[in-house]
């Protein structure tokens, strides 16, 4: 869509307008933009841009970018923005910088974008200073420079910069962590209608001690009203957990649904879990998978993983290992360690793929490096049994130890067993017992309880040990460990 191709209702006024001064054209251009009468503005702004008014050139570029449909429209928009910037329009430079970041109508060039943001900021564009601050914070990780730029933009009443500056204080990025100062800046951002500022303030009240659920709710509501998906999602959490309000699953679901509709992948995945786990609604696995898949489409690693699990188990859908593999792969690519481990399980068992123990172990390693206890434990199993890797008890112990430190109960049990038997490590009954106890008493793992029961069963010197053995076999049985049930039955028969 070219400017020359556009016809608007202002044509009857052209003779009158042609007699106006360039200053009047520019003023009329701004007034029409303020009224959001973009069709009329385009004709007027074109004249004032030709007369050398930078703002009008910027406005033309914005209109074309907003309503353009082809790459040619973006190229034409970039041309107007370039002219605007050359005429020292701060907004024109800032917007053109964004074009270079995204490669809209121009060759993508982050260095050129930085140069343009720098010029915009020097021309006192709060937007330019903010975007330049983002470059220094995220790309260059120069916290001092980012802080200085956010401070300038915040002083120019740019709410997003106040929020980002607060975020730096909240997390201690390049400055001493200061929650009180962060909250002041979040409040200023929120007052400047930054939904991110309202959300961040709510987040601080919700999660930081001393927690203030009432203030968290107030600020999440402000953020949600301004269409912040994160604000709506966390407001849903408040109602699910009954924090400062009466627990209300329906209200929670409404807010989480809104967050999903605002394209929060996490919210869509959470909504899937609400239907899968019957949280305030009747279980509906078809709805669950619909929301999980939408979450996955929005790059929620959990959404992809739970979709894969339903295909793996054939719940709500026909069992399909190929589909499970596809969704585990995407989730793993999104750095979900548990999905990498589950994908490794498919290759380990040959489910929907040709069995490949070596590749399975590689996936377990990737999962473990992403701090998946399941992945570390599976890799420990591979080294213990020599599956896809050379058998190595020492390596097995290392990975069981890491998995146990990640609170994976099965691995704590296996680590204890290695100390019990002296596999890859000196025999140490004290460490064996300690790991069994963590597995059973702390992490409620049936296998660990079974091993702990066995530990006490072999201590035949007193009746107290026999009672403890019975206690832990009983717990193992209640946790679904069949061998624990069998040992418990033997003890009961003997009695």
Model-derived features: positions:
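Hydrophobic face of amphipathic alpha-helices that form TPR/SEL1-like repeat modules
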Residues: 31, 59-66, 95-102, 131-139, ...
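Short helix-capping/linker turns of helical repeat alpha-solenoids
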Residues: 36, 50-54, 66-68, 87-89, ...
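Classical Sec-dependent N-terminal signal peptides that target proteins to the secretory pathway
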Residues: 1-26
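Terminal, low-structured helical/coil segments at or just beyond the last alpha-helical repeat
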Residues: 475-495
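Alpha-helical segment of the N-proximal tetratricopeptide repeat
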Residues: 27-40, 44-47, 51, 66, ...
